[in-house]
Design a protein with these regions (language model features):
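Glycine- and acidic
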Residues: 26-29, 230-232
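Basic-flanked hydrophobic alpha-helices used for secretion and membrane insertion
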Residues: 52-246
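Short alpha-helical basic/polar micro-motif
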Residues: 11, 42, 90
Length: 246
């Protein structure tokens, strides 16, 4: 290399090799980023259907929420008439129709007890649960299974660790009958939260639990629960025809 006969030739070759190496390194880095971008985009694209299937298991979901002025769910009859008119206008048909009322609130789990106050709720803790409460009539409409529950008794299913034979909510204790599965699917687990489903004997017991939960949170702090009516169904026709029905 240091010989005068080929010093210029060899030094020029080494210089060009170093420049080429820098260029190749840049190309490798850019190629890697292209692969990462393509794979991430494809994963997101492919995962959209799976996410939608969990979050919205049926073609149409209508939710009527508690009116804060009257603290009641609006009358569902006008909404159902609008749906019927849309079916008549478009010629589409409904199937797998489900209508049910639920009370929904968040709580922090400690063993077989749920803390109804939201002071420690961060939205990221593994002990945070979304609690969905419905009555046996709504459960029968979803599953086709008729069940009879005694006062103070509830069916329970969770996608987290199973609860014991009892559950303490605020100052009240429920006797639990565990379910092996549950047809009402929520997207809470996708967001990192577990979901607990409770089936109460009747609507009055659901409303009583809601009143107790709201009274407890009013005294100790926390978020008041809402009574919602959910109407779900599948539609015949193509995606475009379903959109026209809206």
């Amino acid at each position: 290399y240091y010989k005068t006969s080929h010093f210029a030739t060899v030094s020029g070759l080494i210089y060009r090799m170093s420049r080429n190496a820098a260029g190749l390194a840049s190309i490798c880095i850019l190629s890697t980023m292209v692969l990462v971008t393509v794979s991430t985009t494809m994963s997101l694209y492919k995962g959209v259907d799976a996410y939608a299937a969990v979050q919205w298991p049926q073609d149409m979901t209508l939710t009527l929420m508690t009116d804060p002025r009257t603290n009641t769910v609006p009358d569902v009859a006008p909404v159902l008439r609008v749906v019927d008119d849309a079916m008549t206008r478009t010629g589409l048909t409904q199937s797998n129709v489900h209508g049910y009322r639920t009370v929904r609130f968040s709580a922090l789990r400690s063993g077989d007890a749920l803390d109804l106050t939201s002071k420690q709720l961060t939205g990221s803790s593994a002990d945070e649960y979304t609690v969905m409460v419905l009555d046996t009539e709504g459960y029968a409409g979803l599953t086709g299974e008729q069940v009879t529950l005694a006062p103070g008794e509830a069916l329970a299913w969770t996608d987290g660790a199973a609860f014991g034979d009892t559950l303490t909510l605020g100052g009240d204790t429920l006797r639990l009958r565990q379910l092996d599965s549950f047809s009402l699917v929520s997207g809470s687990s996708i967001m990192g939260l577990h979901t607990l489903y409770l089936v109460m004997p009747d609507l009055d017991s659901v409303l009583e639990l809601r009143a107790q939960q709201n009274a407890y949170t009013s005294e100790h702090g926390g978020t008041r629960s809402m009574l919602n009516y959910t109407y779900q169904f599948d539609l015949s026709g193509t995606d475009d025809e379903q959109l026209d029905a809206l």
